[in-house]
Amino acid sequence: METDGAFIKSIEPADGAAFGSGGYPWSLPAVAALADGLELDPGVTFLVGENGSGKSTLIEAFAVAAGLNPEGGSRNFQFSTRDSHSALSASLKLNRSLRRPRTDFFLRAESFFTTATYLESLRPTEPGERGGDPLAAYGGRSLHEQSHGQSFLALMMNRFGADGLYFLDEPEAALSAQNCFTCVRRMHQLVADGSQFVVATHSPILLAYPGATIYECGEDGLARVDYDDAEPVRLTRGFLAAPERYLRMLLED
């Protein structure tokens, strides 16, 4: 995929980091595979894999290593409800280009409610109080006053901008199939404007983004795969081609 160049070209072990030893998350094959480094696409990089394969652990570690809040938001978000992120980020080295992002954001589906609540807490509470409304950058409307999917799209349409670095953890969790298409279109606009995405997803729709790099997290570590070979695509196609057969196998006593 051709762009003006990636903000982060690759991710490697930091000096002295030991991968593949110890407990969680080092015991995950996908994490251990980082010992060999991971190249990122200058446009869109996807991580796919079963629940528990480590893709969300990787996304979180990449975002934290880039200076973002572990629970979501930008580098300026200072809230914390539970210190649950792993120590993996401290063991990573981001190989950056000379380009620097104009903006950045870490979108976590599981903690987006907390992110929205933090934004609400930053709003002026008294008439005439100094400081602008932080929600202006998110469409001017409370994210809590919208559906989960609407608030996700409000974030992408309003807060995300050109020359941005964005980490998304399962954004499809809040989106209908139709809005997954909207998400792909918005990503395309932002990549054309110099942005870079790293996305963990189960969505065959998002994975169809043209020219994206897809890594599958599995028992053998991290493997680069084509769209047609990605597990979410294969399983979805198989089910849609023969739903009765799949259901018969699943529901047999």
Give the positions of each predicted feature.
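N-terminal pre-Walker A segment at the start of P-loop NTPase domains
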Residues: E2-D36
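ABC ATPase nucleotide-binding domain signature region
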Residues: V44-F46, S56-P124
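Phosphate-binding P-loop
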Residues: V31-P42, R159-G161, Q189
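Conserved P-loop NTPase mechanochemical-coupling segment
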Residues: A116-Q146
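GG-anchored amphipathic helix commonly corresponding to the ABC/SMC/Rad50 NBD signature/C-loop
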Residues: Y138, S142, Q146-E170, Q178-L190
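Loop/turn-to-beta-strand initiation segments
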Residues: T103, A162-L165, V191-V198
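C-terminal lobe/lid and adjacent interdomain/linker elements of RecA-like ASCE P-loop ATPase modules
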Residues: Q178-Q196, S203-D253
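ATP-binding Walker
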Residues: G52-S53
